[in-house]
């Protein structure tokens, strides 16, 4: 192993790659612990890594600000080698790692990347709480970042890189490592199976609790299949983008379905038309409220407030009481972080 990408460099690579990095490959199984390189790979290699990995796309909202001339994050073992570098930021890891925590980037085994679960723990020590939730939701999503894809994303053919259960299992074995407390706390708020960053952001804005700036509508699942009858009485399966379960203090319950703008979430004109047909079937076939949310709507905080009012009015589930005097300020700040164009 010549180098090991970690922290934000690992996150950006994982989220920009269409293929999974296989921890169970025979090649990776041959590598013995300790896996982390002892020191940095050398100036020439560092320069090449910065040129190759330094321009990967990032997800809006994860970091409050993107540092100019971002360096590449590398994991090393020797604390005496962790001095300032022009092209890389060095992070020391002296503990013995399971082989599944470091994944080969290519078959030559020269470059490795930290696993999705390990990466989540690492960046939880660097991000604020909302950023950690967003990063975890991205790692548990069904998309990867792709400049050539519709809306800047494409769909993974092999499913998410990880899931909350796998992350929880990994964290349970990490003792008191740096980042473990916020990583565990944020895990309960992570949403899985999003098909775009904005789909996940919409779910979080609507359903995170008040203290985190959300509208606290209820629990949410993304892209969960539901069974219904169409207008002809035929049994069909449809997959709304968001399924939200609302509940008030008297335990009254209601379900709301939302679909996010197909022109930005999904790919191709035919796919968009299928999504529009799907929305019509959902409206006619399900005995619960259904809403379509456009990208234009999310550009206005007041429009989001209006959507929340409509959802509550359609279900009869009133908002829970709160004593927070700055609630709207918190909600506006979260909306701006997730959706305001910079």
Language-model segments: which ranges?
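Surface segments flanking catalytic/ligand-binding clefts of nucleic-acid enzymes
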Residues: 157-342
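Short gly/ser-rich loop at a beta-strand->alpha-helix junction or flexible surface loop bordering the NTP-binding
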Residues: 1-178, 334-342
């Amino acid at each position: 192993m010549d180098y090991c990408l970690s922290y934000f460099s690992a996150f950006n690579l994982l989220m920009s790659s269409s293929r999974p990095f296989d921890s169970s490959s025979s090649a990776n199984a041959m590598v013995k612990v300790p896996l982390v390189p002892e020191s940095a790979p050398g100036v020439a290699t560092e320069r090449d890594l910065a040129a190759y990995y330094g321009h990967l796309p990032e997800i809006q909202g994860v970091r409050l600000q993107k540092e100019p001339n971002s360096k590449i994050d590398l994991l090393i073992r020797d604390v005496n080698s962790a001095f300032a570098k022009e092209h890389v930021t060095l992070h020391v890891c002296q503990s013995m790692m399971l082989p599944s925590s470091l994944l080969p980037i290519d078959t030559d085994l020269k470059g490795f990347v930290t696993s999705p679960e390990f990466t989540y723990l690492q960046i939880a020590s660097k991000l604020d709480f909302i950023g950690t939730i967003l990063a975890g939701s991205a790692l548990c999503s069904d998309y990867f970042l792709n400049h050539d894809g519709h809306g800047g994303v494409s769909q993974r053919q092999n499913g998410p890189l990880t899931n909350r259960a796998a992350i929880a299992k990994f964290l349970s074995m990490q003792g008191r490592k740096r980042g473990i407390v916020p990583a565990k706390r944020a895990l309960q708020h992570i949403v899985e199976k999003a098909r775009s960053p904005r789909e996940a952001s919409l779910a979080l804005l609507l359903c995170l609790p008040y203290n985190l700036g959300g509208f606290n509508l209820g629990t949410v699942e993304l892209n969960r299949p539901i069974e219904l009858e169409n207008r002809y009485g035929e049994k069909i399966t449809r997959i709304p983008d968001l399924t939200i379960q609302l509940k008030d203090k008297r335990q009254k319950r209601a379900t709301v379905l939302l679909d996010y703008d197909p022109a930005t979430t999904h790919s191709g004109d035919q796919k968009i038309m299928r999504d529009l047909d799907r929305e019509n079937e959902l409206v006619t076939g399900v005995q619960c409220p259904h809403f379509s949310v456009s990208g234009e709507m999310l550009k206005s905080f007041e429009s989001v407030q209006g959507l929340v009012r409509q959802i509550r009015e359609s279900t009869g589930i009133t908002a829970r009481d709160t004593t927070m005097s700055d609630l709207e300020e918190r909600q506006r700040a979260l909306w701006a972080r997730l959706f305001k164009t910079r």
